[in-house]
């Protein structure tokens, strides 16, 4: 696994300008469900228009910021709960090296997990499993993390995320299993941190269970800031959403994370504020590799790339786009552009 990850150490770092530029000309793992027609929130044609730059992305920035903030926390918790280390969480795998040009995947990482055998089956060993296993084995896995803002978490992988995981597995030959990690985080004030179910109920519904872990996210300005830090965990829902949208401007702030179970705010310069978090659900769902997945789906990716090239090369991109759209598919509408971001929330 380590040798494989090292192959891509010089690839564009995730969320860098070079990474964004590469993704504009490729079908990434997160695009795949839409391209295959499996995403109920975003169609092949909306994805095509987005890649062809026919409209300005209307992302749900609050939900994007939330997912980015808690991806790091989820990795820390995965390492703690499974006694492992996540690597390769910043690489970009270009499918060209495996014969799939135009397709890529940017995994959330790779790690080793311990599987324990009991009652004629294998399960993922965590610090919460108080089980004496008949046998154990350590295997490398691909990691895919989601942290929905308010969407309910079910004990299964949403169908529109499965292509992203299978894409990552297909482009990672040494790996035969992935894990889908989905966590339910809730915001709280610093005074609410600890072994209790107190959260900011203006932002989230009340919780009846106790948290698995908690911690603090600290937000610092990149400029000199001398005002007293604010406890963002006590904000009302709308103001907190506005804060998340502001954090989307990454050049204005730096984000710092406490270790899990920390309750004391860190002392550092230019702190604008902080908020507490608690995690109440942390699911780790195994996903086995489908050996033929990418080979079977690649012709659709190729068709998408041909359509994209045709639009970009046209002197009238929008007119060409409309011709490419299926007869039953209307051209871009404001509703379509807005609706696909609902998946993030």
Swiss-Prot record:
Pfam families: YqaJ. Gene3D superfamilies: 3.90.320.10. GO terms for biological process: symbiont-mediated suppression of host NF-kappaB cascade. It is found in: Host cytoplasm. The keyword Transport does not apply. Keywords: Host cytoplasm, Host-virus interaction, Inhibition of host NF-kappa-B by virus. This is Protein D345L. Plays a role in the negative regulation of host NF-kappa-B signaling pathway. Mechanistically, recruits IKKA/CHUK and IKBKB to suppress their kinase activity towards NFKBIA. InterPro entries: NF-kappa-B_Signaling_Reg, PDDEXK-like_dom_sf, Restrct_endonuc-II-like, YqaJ_viral_recombinase. It comes from the Viruses. The keyword Flavoprotein does not apply. It comes from African swine fever virus (isolate Warthog/Namibia/Wart80/1980) (ASFV). GO terms for cellular component: host cell cytoplasm. Its main location: host cell.
